[in-house]
């Protein structure tokens, strides 16, 4: 087992391209995965991902940091939050999200299960 490891998101282990989105995944070993989510203006989870996964809201847990753009997130409990550059965030399962404005949203995510399965199930 390696005690030090690095991967570059510009050379990902896996790339997925759902509508208006690109997800680059890196596998750091020991069941640790991370994702770079690049989301285009006009992207909305309930329009672009919901048809693929078949749930009413996103059922993934998100732990990440925004490096560019803005994302609005609403939860089925009635709460909402907007994240922007420099914001660390968590979104519990049961949310919808969309890009705010005309800038691309880029977030790096560190929940291994979400990084492995986002836009797949």
Which residues does each PLM region occupy?
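Conserved hydrophobic/aromatic beta-strand scaffold that supports enzyme active sites
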Residues: 23-25, 34-38, 63, 80, ...
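Short beta-strand segments in beta-sandwich/barrel cores
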Residues: 44-45, 69-74, 97
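Conserved short histidine dyad/triad with adjacent acidic residue
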Residues: 36-57
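Surface-exposed loop/turn positions
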Residues: 30-32, 43, 87, 93-95, ...
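Short, conserved beta-strand element in jelly-roll/cupin
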Residues: 55-73
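Ligand-binding loop in jelly-roll beta-barrel domains
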Residues: 92-118
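A short, N-terminal "cap"/entry segment at the start of jelly-roll beta-barrel domains
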Residues: 1-38, 46
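Short acidic-glycine-tyrosine-enriched beta hairpin
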Residues: 75-94
């Amino acid at each position: 087992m390696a005690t030090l490891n690095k991967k570059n998101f510009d050379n990902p282990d896996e790339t997925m391209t759902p509508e208006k989105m690109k997800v680059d995944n890196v596998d750091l070993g020991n069941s640790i995965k991370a994702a770079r989510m690049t989301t285009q203006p006009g992207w909305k989870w309930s329009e672009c991902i919901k048809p693929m996964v078949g749930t009413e809201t996103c059922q993934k847990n998100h732990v990440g940091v925004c490096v560019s753009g803005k994302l609005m997130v609403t939860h089925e409990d009635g709460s909402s939050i907007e994240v922007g550059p420099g914001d660390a965030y968590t979104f519990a399962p049961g949310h919808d999200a969309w890009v705010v404005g005309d800038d691309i949203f880029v977030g790096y995510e560190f929940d291994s299960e979400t990084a492995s399965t986002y836009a797949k199930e």
